[in-house]
């Protein structure tokens, strides 16, 4: 997923779904800064602690509704979503992209999930996948 963002190292990247922090760590090696939004406070605290202990100082982990992104830090040079959205990516995320930047997100359409890269109004289906669903609303 990180490779699909085609980063050059100067970007601020948004990650939706921190989980353990592994993908945020990978992104931190490819981007200038990573803002990672995790719905579950316990996961966010643990991932944030681990990332700091391991020296990933360019990662900021927040608790929140990832479908809303982090508009206070937008625009982003790439957005990676690690949970499946239904039919389309959340509009708020697309609005937070820099022109020419990519959003990579698993999408469920018609009972099938695919990893899709969205860029400048176009979409590219990459592969079939299976992710947890994207949960919206206040954590």
Where in the sequence are the language-model features?
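SAM-dependent Rossmann-like transferase core, predominantly class I methyltransferases
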Residues: 2-4
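Conserved nucleotide-cofactor-binding alpha/beta core module
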Residues: 6-125
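Conserved histidine-centered catalytic loops in small-molecule metabolism enzymes
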Residues: 123-136
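Extended, well-structured beta-strand/loop surface patches
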Residues: 139
